[in-house]
Amino acid sequence: MTDNSSISLTPADLEHVPLQPTRLKQVGGDQACIKLSLDAREQTALDALAAKVSHAFVTGAGGFLGKAICQRLIAAGIKVTGFARGRYLELEALGVTMVQGDLVNPEQVKQAMQGCDIVFHVASKAGVWGDRDSYFCPNVKGAANVIAACKALKINKLVYTSTPSVTFAGEDESGINESTPYASRFLNYYAHSKAIAEKMMLDANQSSSTNAAYVLKTVALRPHLIWGPNDPHLVPRVLARGRLGKLKLVGREDKLVDTIYIDNAAYAHVLAALELCQATPKCQGKAYFISNDEPVTMAKMLNMILACDGLPPVTQRVPQMLAYAVGAVLETAYRLLNKQEEPIMTRFVAKQLSCSHYFDISAAKQDFGYSALVSIEEGMKRLKASL
């Protein structure tokens, strides 16, 4: 269990005066026939979940992971309400009822969650650049609003998508497990805000042993580097820089990293949700690292992605200290120029790319039966076919 003593939540963390709020808009969609290629184990888990829940609420439904979760829930016959700032017509076509709104608006969140019996809180502001409020408002206040709505509406199952960044302090993470405490010093607002939100989620969990009529059960999952076909983040960035010949490795030695294929990340969320449906869930009130459980060097991972598009492997290296110095200079310049886009290098990225990041996922295996369905090798075949 993670040591939460280094995380504190103050009233300032929840303060937010929103911009003109997005007007809540609901648009329905007819149930569509979805053809997903599901592993027998995933199909079994989905069938079991469909027997326990009838209506799921998914924040960040239009995102890479959120969409994958929605597709599986709909395929299992579970009604899905998706919550996002945009409409996402492709989800409506699948049968997802999309609700447009803002996580920082508690009334919009509560209204959208009416009638649901399980919540997947996937949405977050991710990145390494931007001011504090741009991360804390959606990530911390948004999480608080989701928890409050669950309690107000008596929704008793809440699955939260966290991140391994909550433990990263700029040092190697080699086979760490959930006993590793939150970082003593956070390297960006994203990691800090997600750590606070994760702690809120776990603190909101209520013991199943109580005789109370309503008990909220929560779990947090920490997927690392989600990738696969239609990935809007890692894969396109690697390929774009690879095509320009600007991709470089950071550090003198290869460090191992864990990643997770998109189908595996969605499957882990389904399994955790199913475990929460038990009378005494093993996973409630806990956080879990999840990955493909196949640590590879950063060079190998990048080169496998490049090979999917017929691009040559990356071989050039930049010393970690040089990358860090360049990141510091760029950060200063971007702030002075008030540039909103993310610099191509930051101090955090330099640290991240030169450290190992792989995890002991034994707890996820033991508590809710997770293991990867799709290997990296098979995932790369699917990625190549999609490009």
Curated annotation (Swiss-Prot):
Pfam families named among the record's database cross-references: 3Beta_HSD (PF01073)
Record-listed NADP(+) binding positions: K194
NCBIfam families: oxyalk_red_Shew
Enzyme Commission number(s) of this protein: 1.1.1.412
Example GO molecular function: oxidoreductase activity, acting on the CH-OH group of donors, NAD or NADP as acceptor
Mutant lacking the gene: phenotype: Deletion of the entire oleABCD gene cluster leads to the complete absence of nonpolar extractable products. The oleABCD deletion strain shows a significantly longer lag phase than the wild-type strain when shifted to a lower temperature.
Record's protein name: 2-alkyl-3-oxoalkanoate reductase
One of the GO biological process terms: steroid biosynthetic process
UniProt keyword Translocase, yes or no: no
Annotated function: Involved in olefin biosynthesis. Catalyzes the reversible stereospecific NADPH-dependent reduction of 2-alkyl-3-oxoalkanoic acids to 2-alkyl-3-hydroxyalkanoic acids. The S.oneidensis oleABCD genes produce 3,6,9,12,15,19,22,25,28-hentriacontanonaene, which may aid the cells in adapting to a sudden drop in temperature.
Domain of life the protein comes from: Bacteria
Family of this protein: Belongs to the 3-beta-HSD family.
Active-site residues, record numbering mapped to chain: Y190
Keywords: NADP, Oxidoreductase
Catalytically driven reaction(s): a (2R,3S)-2-alkyl-3-hydroxyalkanoate + NADP(+) = an (R)-2-alkyl-3-oxoalkanoate + NADPH + H(+)
Entry-linked InterPro entries: 3-beta-HSD-like, 3Beta_OHSteriod_DH/Estase, Lipid_A_modif_metabolic_enz, NAD(P)-bd_dom_sf
